A protein has these predicted regions:
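Outer-membrane beta-barrel proteins, especially TonB-dependent receptors
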Residues: 1-171
Length: 171
């Protein structure tokens, strides 16, 4: 479990403001819970499951603040085969995000399944030279800073999706 509280103040002193200054204050809170388990299915085969759940909120002094609150669930399921020369892992990450706002339009819920696969092969049993390869498809939603901070936020931002390929060797 984790709790995070962050506070930011932006003071802009300029004659363009009626009072001669713009004083914005932002408060973000995050509550975070995580649980995981590992089960050995056979000699070289294991199964893991993990759940992360967090709640984020943003308050600020700007009259147009929508006061967003985001609920996020990340569920991962992974299977791994591992012997002295080969490690193969495949996983699936389920992401579910729902957001509420006190003002303005509520963003759509976001749901996504993100697969990943990785292989590592020890070429010679008496040397630690390995060939490896991996594939990952990932999804990231914009942060509250990206969406709601005055002058830099954009509520029309869409989630990012990336596909990652990696091939390499280690010794």
């Amino acid at each position: 479990a984790k709790y995070n509280y962050s506070w930011m103040r932006h003071l802009d002193v300029d004659n363009k403001y009626e009072s001669g200054r713009q004083d914005d204050r932002y408060t973000q809170k995050e509550y975070y819970l995580s649980i995981s388990g590992l089960y050995s299915l056979a000699d070289h085969l294991s199964l893991a499951v993990a759940e992360d759940y967090f709640i984020n909120s943003l308050d600020n002094t700007i009259p147009e603040c929508p006061f967003p609150k985001r609920y996020t669930s990340l569920t991962a399921l992974a299977i791994q085969y591992k012997d002295p020369r080969l490690t193969a892992t495949t996983s699936l990450l389920g992401t579910y995000i729902t957001e509420n706002v006190e003002r303005g339009d509520r963003p759509s819920d976001r749901k996504r399944l993100s697969p990943a696969v990785s292989l590592s092969w020890r070429v010679l049993s008496d040397h630690n030279f390995r060939l490896r390869a991996s594939y990952k498809d990932i999804f990231r939603v914009p942060t509250f800073n990206d969406l709601y901070y005055l002058r830099i936020g954009n509520t029309n931002l869409k989630p990012e999706r990336a596909t990652q390929y990696n091939v390499g060797m280690t010794w």
